[in-house]
């Protein structure tokens, strides 16, 4: 059996796209966050543009990345993520606005929980169905009992 030919290293190729003035650690996290948006899109956890995934920028505890308002999850890229400060001011120029509701929720979490590096907020069909029930998730069925105590 002959060895498999060397595959191009995708991360090396993506590193070549990093803006010259961007910290390599931040670029890597931007790539991972953009990929996370794509995974959520593939799973159908998007509810158009009204869910958010944010990531604290390393070395800047009051700054995080959020998706640009108006773009679908499959359009989010490492380059178009918006870098914003906890007080709502932009941390860098961006051609895209930020969803105010998403900012309010995520800035509150990032401001209160410095150990929360990534915050994910979504409205899945199953999650919303449980949230709409007066008694929430009851543990009277096999599948819901698996979540007892969690």
Identify what each model region corresponds to:
Residues 2-150:
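Glycine-rich flexible loops
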């Amino acid at each position: 059996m002959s060895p498999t030919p060397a595959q191009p290293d995708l991360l090396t190729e993506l590193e070549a796209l990093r803006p010259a003035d961007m910290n390599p650690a931040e670029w890597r996290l931007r790539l991972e966050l953009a990929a996370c948006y794509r995974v959520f899109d593939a799973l159908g956890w998007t509810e158009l543009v009204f869910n958010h995934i944010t990531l604290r920028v390393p070395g800047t505890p009051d700054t995080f990345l959020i998706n640009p308002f108006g773009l679908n999850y499959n359009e989010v890229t490492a380059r178009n993520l918006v870098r914003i400060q906890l007080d709502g001011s932009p941390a860098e120029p961006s051609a895209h606005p930020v969803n105010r509701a998403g900012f309010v929720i995520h800035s509150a979490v990032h401001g209160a929980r410095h150990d929360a590096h990534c915050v994910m907020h979504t409205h899945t069909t199953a999650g919303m169905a449980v949230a709409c029930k007066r008694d929430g998730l009851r543990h009277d069925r096999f599948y819901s009992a698996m979540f007892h105590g969690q």
